[in-house]
Amino acid sequence: MAAKFLRRALVACAATLAVSGLVAAPASADLQKPSQQWLRDSQAGLFLHWGMRTSPGYTSCSAWEKAITDGGWDPAYWVTEAEKLHASYLVLASFHSRLGYSRAWPSKIPGSCSTKRDFLGELVAAAKARGLKVILYMTNDAQWHDEGGHEWLDSAGYSKYKGKTVNLDSQDGFGQFSYDNFFEVMKNYPDLGGFWIDNDNAYWESHDLYQQIYQQRPDYLLSNNNEDTPIMDTISNEQKTGMTPSYDYPQATYTAMPRLTEACFKLPDTGSWWYGGSNSAVNKMLNIGRFITNSGSSIKSLMAETAMVNGKFPSNQEAFNNFAKTYLDAIWESLGGTEGAGYMYGGMQPGFWNDGAHGVITIKGGNQYVHVLTKPSTSTLKIRDNGYRVRRVTNLRTGAAISFSQGGGSLTLSGLSGWDSYDTVFKVETAGRTGTYDPATVTLKASASASGHGGQSASDGSYLTYFDNNKTLPVNLDYDLGAAKKVQYLGLNQREDSVSYARSDTEQSARIKAYKVFVSSDGKDWGSAVKSGTLPSHRGVQFVDLSAVTARYVRLQVTSTYAASSDSSRYKRLRIDETWVGSDYATAAG
């Protein structure tokens, strides 16, 4: 589905629901709002942890501020470095529980360090002048109030200001203090992009903070860290590790499109989020890989760098930024303005390819961009084409034509050599999609389903609806083609609302494991299975290939999924966004 079409569909859907009274402001999590569009159009952001405890560390607010100014801090430097990373926004984290709760802006609210110079305001203005946004980090947490043996919060000062006793070292007291700060910031910074929230506070929730933010600043965005909170615009996924390959960050995410999703990770992948005095190395392959794989799933890469007191980055991070600018410039056609392919936006199958190859695909209009991050052990690359007819393939960097063929459901690139060290990009020009039956002509019934998520929800052409098996296994999905027709394969996009590997006993994949396929002429007599097997626990579109048969009815019987019983929320759970019947494999467009 083209991105423009999706946007129109989402806006129309939101409008319809609002008129019918089914949606209260703000819109539900899975619906797009105009205020989100700039973030949807972006690929990356720059995360800045910078406060009083930035090395060498200060306990005096005025001494910290003087050191910043004396060091020559300039907001334009951060904006320039963000642009090198092709970032569209910056997230400033100075009011952080581990950085002394330092507010890098003037405030009339006592309670923690607040500077006289308006560093936040200067950054917002500098970013706006160059078309970037600034989002402000807000912490929920008082637990680090005395870190390092120094008390960072001033309960007496805040109590006097409020005219009552408030203990800022408690979660409730800190909730009041930070709540007041939200409103002061909203009043003073209309050009701010929104708030990046490091988890909820009960005081905020009981006082309807988020609803009030949207009412006062409807253009602000709200992001929550590691929690998919429906009222928020974005969920951010912090520093995920343990994937194979290690750069494939989306394997550890669990939020289905079109929800805005962000991956926040440290560019020096070891050490603190803030500058602790060292010039840590930056792993090019890991971080370029993270950037590319996130883009291949329409996930925003929020990359953290460790600014020193004067705002400058250590030399290894500056060097990486310079490298990233040149490197990404050369392939930006394959990233800017694209969506991840193999999901709701259409496209070929990403992920695990032949002979050890691994990568993702991005899509823009009729062009798809194959990003090979791990090359195959041979000179051939084979990718499931998902019915797209290919007319031309070129090396994006050189423009050289690539030899290719299509058949059996796959696009095969041959005679490949000269692989890039990080990401070899092939531009695949397509001539439409073929060989699948229109979902409008297929009736899909399920033997079990959760309320509101019946079988037809997975065959209605919309990724805003989905089938849910109500944790019932085995479960049958019966396709009725209306008449006896050729059946070559089944395709399906499972809902990407679980990780794709077992991150822990309680965080596992809710994808199809074992299945059987049956066919019938009357929908009653199914006979023996014509195919049985397992699907991999991988993200993106998946396929069940059959020896071509002619039948009116096809049954996909799912007998097991990957999540173990230790993951009670996902055990036996199956959700499918869309599934379809393929009549023929695609051939090259010539």
Show the residue positions of the predicted features:
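Secretory targeting and sorting signals
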Residues: M1-A29
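Predominantly extracellular/luminal regions of secreted and cell-surface proteins
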Residues: A324, G435-D460
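Solvent-exposed beta-hairpin/edge-strand motifs
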Residues: R384-G399
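Surface-exposed loop/edge segments in extracytoplasmic proteins
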Residues: R397-F404, K524-K531
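Aromatic, loop-rich ligand-recognition surfaces of beta-strand-rich domains
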Residues: I361-G366, T374-G387, T430-Y437, S459-A529, ...
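C-terminal beta-strand-rich structural cap/linker in extracellular carbohydrate-active enzymes
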Residues: G407-T436, R552-V554
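Extracellular/luminal ectodomains and secreted, surface-exposed scaffolds of diverse proteins
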Residues: G359-I361, T398-G409
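Glycan-processing catalytic domains of CAZymes
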Residues: D30-I299, M303-F323, Y327, W332, ...
